[in-house]
């Protein structure tokens, strides 16, 4: 049973209007995507997600360089200096989302983030009428691997981004530790429209993003 639900705020008419706006001006878009009858088939689905909280710490060693050039007669002299740079830091993650349904392409679900978690409500079946609702088929342990990768990449990016003032920076080593503090099973709202065209399945997700699978 889900712990939390993020109720639909965008109703079907608003979702259709957003989709039409996204399609507007795309002169070569096949009619299979934009016909009124097809857009009417848009569906609201509560997608199962696992949300992970964690404390993370990371440290890294980097090689940085600066270069300067000056002319000496007919020659251009370039001087490159190398620096040993160390960085370390800590951060906290709250509610890193990973969809728990194999029917939902992970890349598509990532693309429609972020969600406004301030609108979360304790789960109640009263929010479900009028919408489809999936149950997870990937458990928290399976999904935690994706959350772990996302957190590691985020910490690595923040460490690297803190190194400024050099012409180049290369990573020599990094050590990142993630300590999970909580996980939550939640239902998040997604508007979906599937289209078959030229033998491929296409999907529009909530804010009018389209991709092929």
Predicted regions: what they are:
Residues 2-200:
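Charged, low-complexity helical/coil segments in non-catalytic cytosolic or luminal regions
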